[in-house]
């Protein structure tokens, strides 16, 4: 075999030992480029046709760029050689060996001494016609193409050759000259910490180059938003920088990058035109791969050519992301998906307590079917509107709510389901249906949820009502049970006639006060529902103030329903003050709304002729200053006998049907007024 041309020329005797076919091929390829005896090829700093002037003149292959494509030039150009003192002579002899088919590229390319395992070296580009031609963006032979093979053998390239030794190894680079010489190396070259790699494929791929239009004071251009994550979209191939974290969300075949010094961003696509940076337009290039999004990309100086290779191996697992359709018509458009808007579990919550005769207002749940333990559900579901905003300059794309399981502060699990178009579905109760239908024509209409009739879903009937939280952003919610009693007189009569002890009521009583049940109830291990409800009201502010706080959920997601023993005036005042975080503006709005409600109740024909038991006031406010109060839960609101009317302020005795609603409302307004004035 013939020795490597880097080690010198062969003697005539050694050359004669080669096969005739090799000699013929060697002579044919040498052509007119063979050097005269005694003459040496000029070095990188020398002038001449094969050398390069000191000032950085054009390279020898500039004239061929308009005649041959990249794939065609690979047969005429030398294979890369390692750095060393023989680099110049190797460039000539190695090309001859490769042309004769006698040299095969190594499967493991030699690592450049000036590279560490994670850096991609960049070379300065002189002020030459080549640079001007490349910056002009109109190449006669189109984009550069590289033939990636999985075996990494026989891969001649014009500029650089990057191979992947293995999945866990660093990428190496063989950077050599395009024709007969090596580019001058610099001692203090900035490294590209953000190493980018390509997966090798067995077909031609288009590899673009990114030109940095300007640099910073330390001669290094940097990509913007280096800490932003890049999110791939399945088939559209766009990268969206949400600027929220440092994670990389999976591979893609195209990358959107922002060029320094431009107001717009550069979205790279293989069929898009070039727009020069420094304008508000979009700069489009062609690229394959993606960035790891952890470190900025450093360039050594203006006008330098950088080939960015992206690694698919350092990516985190793919996460499902909605597909976006982005249109650069306006600086910050807001796109909304087609379909009805509603609520989601993490967004808003329900406003109901028990609302049927066989339900207890003490059956507390959270999360639309979760546990009744306050500790289990405290802070588990934040009360804020679900609004995912993905920002990528100059666009703002937001996604609003679709469907959500209803979240309750109190009441039985499964009472609510998500509706459509800003509505909710509450389990059907004929008493509540009749009350809501009458309230739609009563002066109380602005203080109750709108009613849209009965609907069927999955074989069950539901009352369809307005979602009262639709206009709030991250609301804080409080449920106050109004009145001096929360049970109907009919329930007492029924319990006497057909007592039905319940084990669950006994367990609830013992959980609050183990000494509350009588010895007989302890022995039986069960109590009736009216017995439990009467006992419960003696513990809370229902018996002392005419209302009690059922539950509170703050904007930060914390939930508290442990108000069973909140009875003293000072305790209730403290809870109310904490609910509004001492915001006097919110307090004044609540007071004004409650005063309007009281005036309307006193003039309402419906209210005068109905026993309102177990109903609640729903308090809602948010960070924007919006604050409202509504009457909810009419499952135990029943009509009075003919010609009977209630004052709603007198104490209750069995038979007078007084509920103490206005008595409790008067006390609540007085407490809030005191807080607002203090």
UniProtKB/Swiss-Prot annotation:
Activated by calcium/calmodulin. Inhibited by high concentrations of the substrate Ins(1,2,4)P3, and allosterically activated by the product Ins(1,3,4,5)P4. GO terms for cellular component: cytoplasm; nuclear speck; nucleus. ATP binds at residues 426, 466-468, 479, 553, 633. A motif (Nuclear export signal) lies at residues 318-326. Residues 44-58 have a biased composition (Gly residues). It is found in: Nucleus; Cytoplasm. Keywords: ATP-binding, Calmodulin-binding, Cytoplasm, Kinase, Nucleotide-binding, Nucleus, Phosphoprotein, Transferase. SUPFAM superfamilies: SAICAR synthase-like (SSF56104). It catalyses: 1D-myo-inositol 1,4,5-trisphosphate + ATP = 1D-myo-inositol 1,3,4,5-tetrakisphosphate + ADP + H(+). Its EC number is 2.7.1.127. Residues 26-128, 151-300, 328-380 are annotated as: Disordered. GO terms for biological process: cellular response to calcium ion; inositol phosphate biosynthetic process; phosphatidylinositol phosphate biosynthetic process. One of its GO terms (molecular function) is calmodulin binding. Residues 61-76, 107-116, 173-196, 220-236 have a biased composition (Basic and acidic residues). The modification Phosphoserine is found at residues 160, 398. Residues 504-512 are annotated as: Calmodulin-binding. The modification Phosphothreonine is found at residue 330. Belongs to the inositol phosphokinase (IPK) family. PANTHER family: INOSITOL POLYPHOSPHATE KINASE (PTHR12400), INOSITOL-TRISPHOSPHATE 3-KINASE C (PTHR12400:SF106). Catalyzes the phosphorylation of 1D-myo-inositol 1,4,5-trisphosphate (InsP3) into 1D-myo-inositol 1,3,4,5-tetrakisphosphate and participates to the regulation of calcium homeostasis. Can phosphorylate inositol 2,4,5-triphosphate to inositol 2,4,5,6-tetraphosphate. This is Inositol-trisphosphate 3-kinase C. It comes from Mus musculus. The gene is Itpkc.
